Design a protein with these regions (language model features):
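N-terminal Rossmann NAD(P)H-binding glycine-rich loop of SDR-like oxidoreductase domains
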Residues: 3-22
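Active-site-lining helix/loop region of Rossmann-like oxidoreductase modules
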Residues: 6, 146-292, 299
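Helix N-cap at the beta1-alpha1 junction of Rossmann-like dinucleotide-binding domains, i.e.
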Residues: 10, 34-36
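Generic hydrophobic/aromatic pocket-lining and core-packing "Φ" positions
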Residues: 17, 87-88, 322
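A generic structural motif
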Residues: 23-28, 32
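NAD(P)H-binding glycine-rich loop region in Rossmannoid oxidoreductase-like domains
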Residues: 27, 37, 41-110
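Glycine-/Pro-rich loop/turn segments that contact NAD(P) or position catalytic residues
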Residues: 79-183, 222
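C-terminal active-site/capping subdomain that shapes the small-molecule cofactor and substrate pocket
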Residues: 254-378
Length: 379
């Protein structure tokens, strides 16, 4: 399958390219606006990978895809919070499959309704949000609640290592909702809380506690519809160095007071200076997903899944869902024709070999009042 990775030499695109290049079923093309960088990176991969200059925002993007004869486009060039659907629309018009790593709430949640007809006409498959959220997060929730009678609350936190490589586009994406009101499902009703404000302590299995604050992601909207009866869904991000978490809280305060209109415009400055704090952090990052509900025996239960990624390997995690889906498509085993959000398309067991490849440790801890091991089946 001829696969083009847009942003193929970027923070996430490069990781996806390294994973897919050795796959015998994939002919890899590294795409970007700089032909020299794309070609040099492709040559470093070997395995017949090629580089190509391509601009996803150009008016002849569809024609470029058709000229290359691309079967699958993997879109990694964020931030997605500010993007429209021109790229996936062009991919559908070119008759190719589509995967992206979007974490923008509106981009992912509105994706099926906006693109399903176009991809059905093309006879192709499109998946939005093939990343840590909601692809991995939904796989974890499905695993933890297997056999349960109901799930009442879902609480997710991602805690990146301070030393892990940071993409400016990712930073711009999270700054976009800093201090902005975010709609969340809490106590069985919709309410609003400001992004990146009011951090709380979050416990991890293999890391010291960190303070996490609300971020706007697709799960906050997708999960209340996906998991019948759930009363609360929360997502937080927890930065390792406390002063950086407090800095985001200050930016949130300034925006709420009308003193800072567009925090995302600070992304270049914060990206350039972020390394100053690396000496105060580590190479260890991770993620936790906690659920509460009623287990198979009718008892109150609380269960948590943890992952810890050392050696600054944390950024591999957001790439895994796209890698797994691309391999499945190359085998002819992809999701059904049409446009989908990624929730529920992958199982946690499919991620397990990828975790092992990078030496990541996972734990399932049953924290419920029942004290019994009634929750998730073992991996």
């Amino acid at each position: 399958m001829k696969t083009l990775v847009l942003g193929g030499y970027g923070n996430f695109g490069a990781r996806i390219c390294r994973a897919l290049a050795p796959d015998a079923g994939i002919e890899l093309w590294v795409g970007g606006r700089d032909a020299d960088r794309a070609t040099a990176f492709a040559q470093s991969l070997g395995a017949g990978a090629r580089g190509v200059r391509i601009d996803a925002q150009s008016p002849d993007f569809t024609q470029g895809l058709q000229h290359l004869g691309v079967d699958l486009v993997i879109h990694t060039a964020g931030p997605f919070q500010s993007q429209d659907y021109r790229v996936p629309q062009a991919v559908a018009a070119a008759g190719a499959h589509y995967i992206d790593l979007a974490d923008g709430r509106r981009f992912v949640c509105d994706f099926p309704a906006a693109l399903d007809a176009a991809f059905r006409r093309a006879g192709r498959t499109a998946v939005a949000g093939a990343s840590s959220v909601p692809a991995l997060s939904s796989a974890v929730v499905d695993h933890l609640m297997a056999g349960w009678q109901r799930v009442m609350s879902i609480d997710i936190c991602i805690a990146p290592a301070q030393g892990a490589p940071r993409g400016q586009a990712t930073l711009a994406g999270v700054l976009a909702y800093c201090g902005a009101p975010i709609r969340i499902w809490q106590d069985g009703r919709w309410t609003a809380q400001p992004g990146w404000a009011n951090p709380v302590e979050v416990q991890f299995a293999r890391m010291q506690p960190r303070r996490g604050a609300l971020c706007d992601i697709p799960d906050l909207e997708l999960f209340p519809a996906r998991y019948a009866g759930v009363q609360s869904v929360m997502f937080r991000a927890a930065l390792e160095v406390g002063i950086t978490q407090r800095a985001f809280a200050v930016l949130a305060f300034l925006r709420r007071k009308g003193l800072l209109r567009s925090p995302e415009k600070l992304a270049p400055l914060l990206h350039a200076t972020g390394g100053v704090f690396d000496a105060f952090g580590s190479a260890l990052g991770g993620m936790v997903v906690r659920i509460e509900g009623t287990d198979a025996q009718g008892a109150a239960a609380r269960c948590a899944w943890h992952i810890a990624a050392d050696d600054n390997h944390g950024p591999e995690i957001p790439c895994m869902a796209a890698i797994l889906l691309a391999r499945r498509m190359a085998r002819g085993d992809g999701p059904p024709i049409g446009a989908h959000a990624s929730a529920g398309l992958l199982s946690l067991s499919e991620f397990t070999p990828e975790f092992a490849r990078w030496g990541m440790a996972t734990d399932v801890i049953h924290e419920g009042a029942s004290g019994a091991n009634h929750g998730a089946p073992p991996l």
